[in-house]
């Protein structure tokens, strides 16, 4: 190649193609090989080869594939392509001779490759005695470094000794010394030659110290290791080097980082003592061992738990009440209990969290109420399902000796909440099981005991964790499957099934708006009439909650949404009562309605079911026989005994009823409760059966508008029963105008909606004689007269 005097500024064009380099710095007067593979770079090289072969080379700040001007350093080197070679994979191997430093003034083009306006940086330095001394010192250091590196190329040392220019000497030594890429770029950007010599001297001195220490270490440990310990030797070398340089060993750095995190986590003294002990063990373990991973995981769990992190309670009682009312309809008892807790919490800041148990049938909002309580209190919410859990370790955790051991669900839930005072819901607590692996219910005793849970010990953690600030809320469908000891620790709040009035309110205030939102409709597009909602409740659902009601409403809204999307519906849809079958098909359920006329031997009872209440007709018939009692209708054992008691009571009153004893000796009494396929049980039909039998024997009709409930004794006393709320609502729905119930159940009327109480007359009785006087038409004056208390 021809010699060209390209070191003169006027020979370098003002505009140069700029080749971005990754992890490579080119110095002036240095010959360097480059591999070019990017499409833009290949195009740049090809154009340069067809021209003056001059290119600007600047290193990228980050090794991105497609750099922008902001990704490129502004100080670089202009060079000339000496030789190029194309490889089969279309990459180019270049040999480039660096010429002079350049500064990129501005980028003019980015496509098809970078072009920039540049200026050549000229070096003007007088070779003073000080500069000469710095050059000799640098050469001495370079010679020492060469002597410490086996197989160091001798020609590099000779070339360095023949360089007379101070700037070029600094560049040459920097290029051939093991500096990191940022340090090499720093040398390139140091324009002042004296300063450049100083920096290279500093870096070379540091590199020389590292080499001397490495050789010293190598000599010290050479006789102590064998070939199989090569990895250990390298680690020892690295550790010693880092120690001499004042750097920290990665292992030590990890231990220090863990110790710092433990301090920040504010562990209590006992937990901190255990953590320090495990940390000390960790520092002595080889990182590749299984025990190392187990211990590290354990420490991570200790660090991640919210030992001292609490959310601040929202003590604004009015605001909390608004939130509870926004999310749930009615449920006044539950809301009142939460507001009471807030009031006491406001007065006594260190009050322990209550432990509540919501009991009620499915779909009444137990789980969603927990979320609402958390929102009202301003706390985090976490829920775990206990249904089907049979292993105690699910609650208390596994010991760390087991492979894959983890904390129990309580501690996992606390970590998930990231707070030590969340609202913690234990869903389906009545469905806990037990087997040979232990009893989870017994493990929950400690969790739910306010006197013990301030030091709950999970088997995995092995140190106490304070659960006293947590508000635990358990949910259950029934109470009888919950162990008594566990039940005793919880404050039980019953969530009875919703009444028809409540379901109407929930449907209009919550379900319909929510389903409209989920289906992308506005309230201006569809409206439900009250009668239509009532028909859906009565004839298309039979449940205590509102889940199926929401499904049926969603079904109607989907059909309307389809019509709107297809364009067949353009006006507002009003769903009327007669439209419901069109959307949902034939009715799925029927509720009993009152009889059409007063009948002999047919009394109207009131029954409680899991889906609410219903009326129950009891039929009695006197047939030829031998004085036996025949019972049909799939009656349970308690109900059969109640029927026998009712018959015995009526027999004791035959004289008062003007019925001869001979009639019973020649006849059987057949008592039947319709819907024979459905099991029925309980004592509350006693007065109804007695009334039906008395009517059949006396041939006196029973009033069709009156319903009754109550347990009967042999002496005719009427005892209190349960489910009054549901029974009265069923009577109202069936069109009954009067209800007979035990006097001791009078207190239960508080749960009955006022609009229902206004339309029903209530008779409170203590004796079955009163029931017969009220229910049977044309009662004889000879019967013992009583004056039952009456409301209505």
Curated annotation (Swiss-Prot):
The active site is at 684, 727. Residues 16-208 form the Lon N-terminal domain. Its EC number is 3.4.21.53. It comes from the Bacteria. InterPro entries: AAA+_ATPase, ATPase_AAA_core, Lon_bac, Lon_bac/euk-typ, Lon_lid, Lon_proteolytic, Lon_Prtase, Lon_prtase_N. It comes from Dictyoglomus thermophilum (strain ATCC 35947 / DSM 3960 / H-6-12). GO terms for biological process: cellular response to heat; protein quality control for misfolded or incompletely synthesized proteins. It is found in: Cytoplasm. This is Lon protease. Homohexamer. Organized in a ring with a central cavity.
């Amino acid at each position: 190649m021809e010699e060209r005097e390209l070191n003169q500024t006027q020979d370098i064009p003002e505009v140069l193609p700029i080749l971005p380099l990754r992890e490579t710095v080119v110095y002036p007067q240095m010959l360097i090989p480059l591999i070019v593979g990017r499409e833009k770079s290949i195009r740049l090289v090809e154009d340069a080869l067809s021209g003056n072969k001059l290119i600007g080379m600047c290193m990228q700040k980050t090794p991105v594939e497609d750099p922008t001007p902001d990704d490129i350093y502004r100080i670089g080197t202009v060079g000339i392509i000496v030789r190029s070679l194309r490889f089969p994979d279309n990459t180019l191997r270049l040999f480039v001779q660096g010429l002079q430093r350049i500064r990129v003034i501005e980028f003019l083009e980015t496509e098809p490759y970078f072009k920039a306006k540049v200026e050549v940086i000229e070096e003007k330095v007088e070779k003073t005695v000080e500069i000469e001394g710095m050059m000799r010192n640098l050469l001495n250091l370079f010679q020492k470094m060469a002597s410490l590196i086996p197989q160091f190329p001798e020609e590099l040392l000779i070339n360095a000794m023949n360089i007379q220019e101070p700037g070029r000497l600094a560049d040459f030594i920097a290029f051939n010394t093991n500096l990191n890429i940022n340090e090499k770029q720093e040398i390139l950007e140091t324009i002042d030659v004296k300063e450049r010599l100083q920096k290279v001297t500093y870096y070379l001195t540091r590199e020389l110290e590292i080499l001397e220490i490495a050789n010293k270490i190598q000599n010290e440990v050479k006789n102590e290791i064998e070939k199989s310990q090569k990895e250990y030797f390298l680690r020892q070398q690295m550790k010693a080097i880092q120690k001499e340089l004042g750097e920290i060993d990665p292992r030590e750095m990890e231990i220090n980082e863990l110790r710092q995190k433990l301090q920040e986590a504010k562990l209590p003294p006992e937990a901190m003592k255990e953590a320090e002990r495990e940390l000390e063990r960790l520092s002595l373990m080889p990182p590749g061992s299984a025990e190392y991973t187990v211990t590290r995981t354990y420490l991570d769990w200790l660090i991640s738990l919210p030992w001292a992190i609490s959310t601040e309670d929202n003590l604004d009682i009015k605001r909390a009440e608004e939130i509870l009312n926004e999310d749930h309809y009615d449920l006044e008892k539950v809301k009142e209990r939460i507001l009471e807790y807030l009031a006491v919490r406001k007065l006594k800041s260190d009050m322990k969290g209550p432990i509540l148990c919501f009991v009620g049938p499915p779909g009444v909002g137990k789980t969603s109420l927990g979320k609402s309580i958390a929102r009202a209190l301003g706390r985090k919410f976490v829920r775990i399902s206990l249904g089907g859990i049979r292993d105690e370790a699910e609650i208390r955790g596994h010991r760390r000796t087991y492979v894959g051991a983890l904390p129990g669900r309580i501690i996992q839930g606390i970590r998930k909440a990231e707070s030590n005072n969340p609202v913690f819901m234990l869903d389906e607590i009545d469905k806990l099981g037990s087997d040979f692996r232990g009893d989870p219910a017994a493990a929950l005793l400690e969790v739910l005991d306010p006197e013990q849970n301030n030091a709950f010990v999970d088997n995995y953690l092995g140190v106490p964790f304070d659960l006293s600030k947590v508000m635990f809320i358990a949910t259950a469908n029934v109470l009888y499957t919950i162990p008594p000891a566990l039940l005793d620790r919880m404050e039980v709040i019953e969530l009875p099934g919703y009444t028809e009035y409540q379901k109407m309110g929930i449907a209009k205030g919550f379900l319909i708006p929510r389903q409209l939102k989920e289906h992308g409709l506005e309230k201006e597009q569809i409206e439900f009439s009250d009668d239509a909602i009532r028909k859906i409740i009565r004839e298309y659902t039979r449940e205590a909650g509102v889940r199926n009601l929401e499904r049926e409403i969603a079904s109607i809204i989907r059909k309307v949404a389809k019509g709107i999307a297809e364009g067949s519906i353009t006006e507002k849809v009003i769903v009327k009562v007669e439209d419901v079958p069109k959307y949902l098909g034939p009715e799925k359920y029927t509720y009993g309605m009152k009889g059409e006329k007063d009948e002999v031997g047919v009394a109207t009872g009131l029954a409680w079911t899991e889906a609410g209440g219903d009326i129950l007709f009891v039929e009695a018939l006197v047939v030829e026989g031998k004085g036996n009692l025949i019972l049909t209708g799939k009656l349970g054992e308690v109900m059969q005994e109640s029927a026998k008691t009712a018959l015995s009571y009526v027999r004791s009153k035959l004289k008062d009823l003007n019925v001869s004893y001979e009639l019973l000796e020649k006849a059987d009494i057949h008592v039947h409760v319709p819907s024979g396929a459905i099991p029925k049980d309980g004592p509350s039909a006693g007065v109804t059966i007695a009334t039906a039998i008395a009517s059949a024997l006396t041939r006196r009709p029973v009033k069709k508008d009156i319903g009754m409930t109550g347990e009967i004794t042999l002496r005719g006393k009427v005892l209190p029963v349960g489910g009054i709320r549901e029974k009265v609502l069923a009577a109202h729905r069936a069109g009954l105008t009067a209800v007979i119930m035990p006097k001791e159940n009078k207190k239960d009327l508080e749960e009955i909606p006022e609009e229902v109480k206004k339309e029903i007359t209530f008779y409170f009785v203590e004796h079955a004689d009163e029931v017969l006087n009220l229910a049977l038409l044309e009662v004889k004056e000879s019967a013992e007269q009583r004056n039952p208390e009456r409301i209505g």
